[in-house]
Amino acid sequence: EGRANTVRSRNARLAAIKAFFRFLEPRRPACLEQAMMIRSLPVKRTDAKLIDYLTKDEVRALLAAPDGRAPAGLRDRAMLHLAYAAGLRASELLAVRMDDFPRGSFANIRVLGKGRRERVLPLWKETQAAIRAWLAVRPNDVGPELFLNRDGRPLTRDGFAYRLRQHVAVAERATPSIADKHVTPHVLRHSCA
């Protein structure tokens, strides 16, 4: 208590100590009683922190932020539209491949999610248009991933987060309230829900 550690830190340390005593139990039977006492210590409860989300105006400003005249801007606009409209995790978004659109239509997208669960999601007309605009300028002689960096390789999670930060800075000019929020790919996902 005197160290002013957060509840999360205390729980992490307690978990490490409990794991150590689980390791000790079969090796040192003399410590069994003490190990059982330590393993029975409860973890501290914490309040679940609410995840930020964007208002409709903030989302509109963010979706309009990428420069629609440049290939990177068209890619970013398609990424942001798809992330928001489908509520995708960053890993799901960056794993989207050209063949994830059933029958070549952009009305639906097949997503392989957490736990290798596959789901098919409908896409809004604006999202479909953004994807078509990106595909019109996307290089054809590269990998199957939908979103590529400027070298033609699949865009990374850090690359997406970097581009998102840049577009949030642009969106702040149109909607200053977005500056008060820590916008991450996960916040974009929660804004959809």
Language-model features and meaning:
Residues E1-C192:
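Conserved catalytic core of the tyrosine transesterase superfamily
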